[in-house]
Amino acid sequence: MSATVRILGIDPGSRVTGFGIIDVRGRDHFYVASGCIKTPPDAPLADRIAVIVRHIGEVVAVYKPQQAAVEQVFVNVNPASTLMLGQARGAALAALVSHKLPVSEYTALQVKQAVVGKGKAAKEQVQHMVVQMLGLSGTPQADAADGLAVALTHALRNHGLAAKLNPSGMQVKRGRFQ
């Protein structure tokens, strides 16, 4: 019987940070918890960062994940938005590493590819697949579903069949191991 691994997935945002926690046992994935960390929109950036750090710390303390995964920042058309998103992501990373969690990072494209099967999937498709993959009775909020999708991506890439077929962690580029 294989051991259970608990994974925390984070979808960082300066206004709403989504999180999802799953347990992985062999090839099976089990829903544990998910939610959204909402920051006061009128608060100074430093206060919003503090909210993200504090709440992620509370989630880690309550659910005790063994691994974490965070979605990487994409470059937005608006540089100020990209910068704020990067700061929220930095807050999430700081909170996770302060709890000594190993952290992996995935692009939105990698998350959509792993969960939906295509990198250009819509948010609704991600939500639908999260519900299907975890056997949920309802649809989580979009940001929470994204957090769960990040956790599932980490599970599929590091604990699934792909990881067993490629134990050295090599990447495939143009059909060849690199």
Curated annotation (Swiss-Prot):
Active site: D11, E71, D143
Residues that, per the record, bind Mg(2+) 2: E71
Any GO molecular function: magnesium ion binding
EC numbers, comma separated: 3.1.21.10
GO terms (BP aspect): DNA recombination; DNA repair
Catalysed reactions listed for this entry: Endonucleolytic cleavage at a junction such as a reciprocal single-stranded crossover between two homologous DNA duplexes (Holliday junction)
InterPro entries assigned: RNaseH-like_sf (IPR012337), RNaseH_sf (IPR036397), X-over_junc_endoDNase_Mg_BS (IPR020563), X-over_junc_endoDNase_RuvC (IPR002176)
Gene3D superfamilies: Ribonuclease H-like superfamily/Ribonuclease H (3.30.420.10)
Superkingdom: Bacteria
GO cellular component terms listed in the entry, alphabetical order: cytoplasm; Holliday junction resolvase complex
Cell compartments where the protein resides: Cytoplasm
Protein residues bound to Mg(2+) 1: D11, D143
Alphabetical UniProt keywords: Cytoplasm, DNA damage, DNA recombination, DNA repair, DNA-binding, Endonuclease, Hydrolase, Magnesium, Metal-binding, Nuclease
Cofactor: Mg(2+)
Cofactor note: Binds 2 Mg(2+) ion per subunit.
PROSITE patterns with a match to the protein in the record: RUVC
Quaternary structure note: Homodimer which binds Holliday junction (HJ) DNA. The HJ becomes 2-fold symmetrical on binding to RuvC with unstacked arms; it has a different conformation from HJ DNA in complex with RuvA. In the full resolvosome a probable DNA-RuvA(4)-RuvB(12)-RuvC(2) complex forms which resolves the HJ.
Annotated NCBIfam families: ruvC
Record family assignment: Belongs to the RuvC family.
Function according to Swiss-Prot or TrEMBL: The RuvA-RuvB-RuvC complex processes Holliday junction (HJ) DNA during genetic recombination and DNA repair. Endonuclease that resolves HJ intermediates. Cleaves cruciform DNA by making single-stranded nicks across the HJ at symmetrical positions within the homologous arms, yielding a 5'-phosphate and a 3'-hydroxyl group; requires a central core of homology in the junction. The consensus cleavage sequence is 5'-(A/T)TT(C/G)-3'. Cleavage occurs on the 3'-side of the TT dinucleotide at the point of strand exchange.
Protein's name in the database: Crossover junction endodeoxyribonuclease RuvC
Source organism of the structure: Neisseria meningitidis serogroup C / serotype 2a (strain ATCC 700532 / DSM 15464 / FAM18)
Native organism taxonomy: Bacteria, Pseudomonadati, Pseudomonadota, Betaproteobacteria, Neisseriales
